[in-house]
Amino acid sequence: MPRRRRVLKRRPLEPDYQFSDLVISKFINMLMWNGKKTTATHIVYGAFEDLKTKGEDPLKVFRKAIDSVKPEIEVRSRRVGGANYQVPMDVRPERKLSLSCKWLIDAARARVGRSMQEKLSAELYEAAQGRGGAMRKREEVHKMAEANRAFAHFRW
């Protein structure tokens, strides 16, 4: 009887059917609630259509929004000598992508009124311009890291 739990292998992520892009597929999966992937897909593609009606290339706006929201540094709690310190650390590339997607989705959900499709397209557009709720969240995280720079020597 083995003592270790068996670790299940991760299923590979399928690219989305319209753009064949893994990042969009991950974004759709993160937007999805209660397993309703079709609804999440309609929301994302509808937001892309809204961006297209504004005269923008939706794929470029999406990529620019994701890249501009990605955090470079974040704080993590580290216990040293009975005290917890917020230690600034670099963010791994996979986590950068996850955090930027999460922040964009949360900022879109926090917007008031209208449909989720319109809120998401507005948030993507603003993030690509360097504005919006997701960019505020990124700046907040960077400010926290800057404020706790004195504890950077606790990195491991």
Predicted regions mapped to residue ranges:
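Strongly charged
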Residues: 2-34, 38, 45-156
